[in-house]
């Protein structure tokens, strides 16, 4: 039986190892909630790749898609992941 820390690490690792996921979540956290805003805020990202990644994030309940307002909102899990991304950036600046 795996421990909570191992399970938690695996879940986070499965998401952050995917290209563009940190950038998408950080973009949403900065207020880019509409599809085109997210796309325009990330250089070199294609429509196809953004669609794929947003589908994964919705499926994993990291973001919620609001079809009425046509926007994406971070779930609590997504907010926690953004916090982790910023912490990792701080560690990189401090130690590398």
Q: What kind of region is each of these model predictions?
A:
Residues 2-49, 71-76:
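N-terminal helix-turn-helix DNA-binding core of bacterial DNA-binding proteins
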Residues 7-8, 83-96:
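Amphipathic alpha-helical dimerization/coiled-coil segments
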Residues 58-67:
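A short, conserved structural fragment
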Residues 53-57:
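Basic amphipathic alpha-helical segments that dock to polyanions
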Residues 69-88:
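Basic, amphipathic "hinge/linker" alpha-helix immediately C-terminal to the N-terminal HTH DNA-binding motif
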């Amino acid at each position: 039986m795996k421990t909570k820390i191992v399970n938690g690490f695996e879940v986070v690792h499965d998401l952050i190892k995917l290209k563009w996921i940190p950038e998408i979540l950080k973009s949403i956290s900065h207020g880019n909630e509409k599809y085109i805003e997210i796309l325009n805020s990330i250089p070199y990202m294609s429509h196809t790749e953004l669609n794929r990644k947003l589908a994964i994030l919705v499926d994993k309940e990291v973001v919620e898609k609001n079809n009425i307002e046509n926007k994406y909102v971070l779930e609590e899990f997504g907010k926690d992941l953004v916090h982790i991304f910023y912490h990792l950036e701080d560690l990189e600046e401090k130690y590398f």
